[in-house]
């Protein structure tokens, strides 16, 4: 906590990737800029102020006392369609959002990095390189013992129904549950287990992604992987949790409440309509830049120097936006020569990873 307080007191820009109590509660110096780069892609399960006084959410009194999600200068979103939902969740005006994506989107689409991760996975689990297609099952966490038991039973059913003549099955449990991965190849009795990679990592070797109510769907979309929704407990889960989008009609995925249906979809090569996939991807995970991370670097520098012009803000940015260096290269040569570079600024950036809300994952 004291380390965070020092960061807020001495930094020009603070970058968060989750809920930080001190960011919201403290009275900061006027020139401090706080950027919230929320850790989950897309807008799916309701969270934050959208679920106040509801099951799984905080109370209104707690939110008011802790000034939940206050003091943000800018808030990142992975696509334009996320902004109205995030505005509700954070209790912030839409004009404060920058729908330019988040750095994780670079990782998901970096071919060299993905090849490196794939190599590491196959080194650890060489049985996944046996010529068969790999199915990744990455369910979200469950809150109660009853729900966790139901998930365990559904997972066992999927393990039993998989056709190991044609497929391998990777089960990656949510970090809130066990974080374990289980690799099934020749049969359900032939299993390797560990805790070495994330679900996002396993997408580097996956051919199909099976999930339920997880933002994994957005990660799979960026990698152009077919998505299947194994919604064995949908009646209960949807009633209790709530979604920003229509669970049954908006997602570019195929649905089944039983494992056989999921396995049949995959075996027959069925996937969602490609036009629906592309439309949804552009709305919720629109990768406008080759390097989103580089754009954040420039944005942070401009905020620290007090020269950010608002070009990335919601309602201003468009799909034909150019990276800043391309805009600068289009300027007249004599203007570039007559305008010396600004002196270097030593920007202190504090990244918070200690206090996060996991509701959306």
Regions found by a protein language model. Give the residues of each.
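Active-site and donor-binding regions of nucleotide-sugar-utilizing enzymes
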Residues: 1-112
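Donor nucleotide-activated moiety binding/catalytic core segment of transferases
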Residues: 2-9, 175-218
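Short active-site oxyanion
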Residues: 12, 70-75, 168, 205-208, ...
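A donor-sugar binding/catalytic signature common to diverse glycosyltransferases
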Residues: 14-20, 25-28, 33-38, 196-241
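Helix N-cap/beta->alpha junction signal
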Residues: 18, 78-81, 173-175, 213, ...
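Conserved catalytic-core segment of nucleotide-activated headgroup transferases in glycan assembly
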Residues: 97-183, 256, 316
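C-terminal amphipathic helix plus adjacent low-complexity
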Residues: 113, 259-260, 264-334, 338-342, ...
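Catalytic binding pocket for nucleotide-activated donors in carbohydrate/polymer assembly enzymes
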Residues: 215-284
């Amino acid at each position: 906590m004291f380390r965070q307080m020092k960061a807020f007191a001495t930094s020009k820009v603070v970058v968060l990737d989750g809920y930080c109590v001190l960011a919201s509660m403290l009275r900061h110096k006027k020139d401090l800029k706080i950027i919230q780069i929320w850790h989950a892609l897309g807008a799916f399960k309701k969270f934050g102020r959208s679920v106040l006084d509801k099951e799984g959410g905080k109370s209104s009194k707690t939110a008011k006392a802790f000034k939940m999600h206050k003091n943000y200068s800018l808030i990142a979103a992975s696509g334009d369609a996320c902004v109205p939902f995030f505005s509700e969740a954070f209790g912030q005006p839409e004009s404060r959002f920058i729908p330019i994506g988040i750095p994780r989107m670079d990782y998901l689409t970096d071919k060299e990095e993905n090849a490196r991760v794939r190599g590491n996975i196959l080194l650890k689990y060489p049985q996944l390189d046996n010529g068969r297609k790999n199915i990744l099952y990455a369910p979200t966490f469950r809150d109660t013992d009853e729900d966790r038991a139901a998930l365990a039973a559904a997972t066992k059913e999927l393990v039993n129904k998989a056709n190991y003549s044609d497929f391998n099955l990777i089960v990656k449990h949510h970090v809130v549950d066990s974080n374990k991965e289980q690799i099934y190849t020749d049969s359900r009795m032939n299993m390797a287990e560990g805790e070495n990679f994330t679900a996002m990592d396993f997408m580097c070797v996956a051919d199909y992604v099976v999930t339920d109510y997880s933002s994994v769907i957005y990660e799979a979309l960026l990698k152009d992987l077919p998505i299947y929704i194994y919604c064995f407990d949908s009646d209960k889960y949807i009633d209790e949790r709530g979604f920003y989008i229509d669970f049954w009609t908006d997602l570019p995925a195929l649905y089944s409440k039983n494992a056989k249906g999921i396995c049949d979809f995959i075996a027959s090569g069925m996937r969602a309509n490609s036009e629906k996939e592309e439309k949804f991807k552009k709305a919720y995970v629109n990768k406008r830049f080759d390097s989103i991370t580089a754009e954040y670097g420039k944005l942070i520098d401009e905020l620290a120097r007090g020269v950010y012009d608002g070009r990335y803000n919601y309602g201003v940015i468009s799909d034909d936006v150019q990276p800043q260096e391309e805009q600068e290269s289009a300027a007249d040569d004599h203007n570039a020569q007559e305008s010396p570079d600004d002196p270097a600024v030593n920007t202190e950036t504090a990244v918070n990873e200690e206090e996060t809300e996991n509701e959306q994952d």
